[in-house]
Amino acid sequence: MVTEGLKPHISIKKKKRKSGFLARMRTKSGRKIIARRRRKGRKRLAP
């Protein structure tokens, strides 16, 4: 029997460092992601 809904939790610090707003702004491709999310009208641009 397989249980579903349990996923590994990453620490908030690791999440922010990897995929936070400032991390996105550091790279060209990250800036493209932010621009794309702005165009789409996302309320949250980065987690």
Curated annotation (Swiss-Prot):
Keywords: Ribonucleoprotein, Ribosomal protein. InterPro entries: Ribosomal_bL34. One of its GO terms (cellular component) is ribonucleoprotein complex. Coiled coil: none annotated. GO terms for molecular function: structural constituent of ribosome. Residues 10-47 have a biased composition (Basic residues). Residues 1-47 are annotated as: Disordered. The keyword Ribonucleoprotein applies. The keyword Ribonucleoprotein applies. GO terms for biological process: translation. Belongs to the bacterial ribosomal protein bL34 family. NCBIfam families: rpmH_bact. This is Large ribosomal subunit protein bL34.
